[in-house]
Curated annotation (Swiss-Prot):
Species per Swiss-Prot/TrEMBL record: Saccharomyces cerevisiae (strain ATCC 204508 / S288c) (Baker's yeast)
Residue ranges with Basic and acidic residues bias: 393-403
Stretches assigned to coiled coil: 39-115
Keywords carried by this UniProt record: Coiled coil, Transposable element
Region (Disordered): 378-414
BP-aspect Gene Ontology terms: viral translational frameshifting
Miscellaneous information on this protein: Retrotransposons are mobile genetic entities that are able to replicate via an RNA intermediate and a reverse transcription step. In contrast to retroviruses, retrotransposons are non-infectious, lack an envelope and remain intracellular. Ty4 retrotransposons belong to the copia elements (pseudoviridae).
Name of the featured protein: Transposon Ty4-J Gag polyprotein
Start-end of Polar residues biased regions: 404-414
Record bears the keyword Magnesium: no
Signal sequence region: none
Length: 414
């Protein structure tokens, strides 16, 4: 049976099998009659016939060699007989290897033809998409019923969308279109990836033209749109409004969302200044640690030191998971000990006592002397120590009182 050309199904990207798709499949026989398809079929058939002719020729040679081997006279000289048998045996082995090679080539052509027929049938009935990748010689299958389950209508959640999309394509063994080395992929694979990522973009989030059919343009456009929004937000923030996380944070999902945005923004910035940053892991870890209050930071560092990093997990994902687990383990048990949000900045990531915007504080929460002023989260409040200037002033007042008392006693004696 003739092999269908790629154009028969490469534009079919709808999960539901519509009448248009069915009609496209029904016209396969017509498509095969094009000069291009007929030429491909002719070349393949000629190749098979050539293999068959060579196979028959080698089989004839093999039969002749075996017959010659049987006719060798036992009356000949033993040494001559051994030499003839050895030479004949080597020739027979070469012919047999050549026959095996030809049989495998013929079977491969037949298998590819059957796969193309199966591809045409199953893809048209909506079971899966079949595509080629740059990183594998085998064909890959993406089940049509596996839908990209992340949706967003908010531009602020684009980093999460891209992160989930990257995990999704890794799961189904697509080419990693986030790698700088990959600049072009199979057209069919490109169409499938465009369809998948558009499933995650809500109707109100019309960042890219819905008719765009280049996955690289879509990803680049999403990154640029997101970085512009994030840069504007960061420029409008005051220093005291940066993210601060302590052990009272209970909203793990929101915290993970925030840390993922931070990591993805850092990665995007570094990708613009250098293609392959050797210290990227250290920079990402420093960025995450910079958001943690000292009551949490040391515990996270200890866990990162003690727990080995699973090579199957990205380093940034390992960092974020470690922070989340540490927050959960160190958070106070009683809910009544935790505020719903900070009374100064309304953040849900830290309590009021640690807020950088808290007024009239003598010490900042990231100061090395903070432990002298307040206990860690969940402990009782401690009275702040008086400064040296205050202690000196109190001492002077006490000295004056003593002098006045002595003077009064002397006056009374007189």
């Amino acid at each position: 049976m003739a092999t269908p050309v790629r154009g028969e199904t490469r534009n079919v990207i709808d999960d539901n099998i519509s009448a248009r798709i069915q009609s496209k499949v029904k016209t396969n026989d017509t498509v095969r009659q094009t000069p291009s398809s007929l030429r491909k079929v002719s070349i393949k058939d000629e190749q098979v016939r050539q293999y068959q002719r060579n196979l028959n020729r080698f089989k004839t040679i093999l039969n002749g060699l075996k017959a010659e081997e049987e006719k060798l006279s036992e009356a000949d000289d033993i040494q001559m007989l051994a030499e003839k048998l050895l030479k004949l045996g080597e020739t027979i082995d070469k012919v047999e290897n050549r026959i095996v090679d030809l049989v495998e080539k013929i079977q491969l052509l037949e298998t590819n033809e059957n796969n193309n027929i199966l591809h045409e049938h199953i893809d048209a009935t909506g079971t899966y998409y079949l595509f080629d990748t740059l990183t594998s010689t085998n064909k890959r299958f993406y089940p049509k019923d596996c839908v990209f389950d992340y949706r967003t209508n908010n531009v602020e959640n684009i980093p999460i969308l891209l992160n989930n999309f990257k995990k999704f394509i890794k799961k189904y063994q697509f080419d990693d279109v986030f790698e700088n080395d990959i600049i072009e992929i199979d057209p069919r694979e490109n169409e499938i990836l465009c369809k998948i990522i558009k499933e995650g973009l809500g109707e109100s989030l019309d960042i890219m033209n819905t008719n765009t059919t280049d996955i690289f343009r879509i990803i680049d456009g999403l990154k640029k749109q997101n970085i512009e929004v994030c840069m504007v937000e960061m420029s409008e923030l005051e220093p005291g409004e940066k993210v601060l996380v302590d052990t009272t944070c209970r909203n793990s999902a929101l915290l993970m969302n925030k840390l993922q945005k931070l990591v993805l923004m850092e990665k995007w910035i570094f990708s613009k200044c250098c293609q392959d940053c050797p210290n990227l892991k250290d920079y990402l870890q420093e960025a995450i640690m910079g958001t943690l209050h000292e009551s949490l930071r040391n515990s996270v560092k200890q866990r990162l030191y003690n727990i080995p990093h699973d090579v199957g997990i990205d380093h940034e994902e390992f960092l974020i998971n470690t922070v989340i687990e540490t927050v959960i383990d160190l958070s106070p048990i009683a809910d009544d000990q935790i505020e719903n949000s900070c009374m100064y900045c309304k953040s849900v990531f830290h309590c009021s006592i640690n807020c950088k915007k808290k007024p009239n504080r003598e010490l900042r929460p990231d100061s090395t002397n903070f432990s002298k002023t307040y206990y860690l989260q969940g402990a009782q409040r401690q009275q702040p120590l008086k400064s040296s200037a205050k202690r000196t002033k109190v001492l002077e007042q006490d000295t004056k009182k003593v002098e006045q008392s002595v003077q009064q006693q002397k006056t009374g004696n007189y």
